[in-house]
């Protein structure tokens, strides 16, 4: 049976002045959303978590675009904690896809930079 996890990230900008040697990324994940689809492409489960940024911060544009507020992120898990929960949620036999390669590249870059 084929299952698909479709992932979508929301990100905030990391100001150039906040980019440190250990984190060079221009963006930082603030939300991981995903749906699990069965072989008929029907939604059978959902995953959603906010992610507390370590280097970036919300600006009015991202809040207006996503509806995510600083209050949502204040007690959110770190990227390490969020990724651990996300990976545990993904079935072993599922194919993971995203709307574009940007989200998968973001996960890779951020995981590498944060030693996840």
Question: What are the residue ranges of the model-derived segments?
Answer:
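Conserved non-catalytic scaffold segment of RNase H-like nuclease domains
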Residues: 2-108
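A short alpha->loop->secondary-structure connector
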Residues: 113-116
């Amino acid at each position: 049976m084929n299952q698909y996890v479709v992932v979508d990230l929301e990100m905030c900008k990391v100001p150039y002045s906040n980019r440190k040697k250990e984190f060079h990324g221009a963006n930082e994940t603030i939300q991981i959303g995903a749906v699990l689809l069965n072989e008929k492409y029907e939604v059978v489960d959902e995953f959603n978590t906010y992610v507390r940024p370590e280097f970036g911060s919300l600006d009015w544009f991202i809040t207006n675009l996503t509806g995510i507020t600083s209050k949502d992120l204040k007690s959110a898990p770190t990227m390490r904690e969020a990724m651990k929960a996300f990976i545990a949620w993904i079935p072993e036999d599922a194919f993971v896809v995203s709307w574009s390669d940007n989200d998968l590249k973001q996960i890779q870059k951020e995981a590498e930079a944060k030693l996840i």
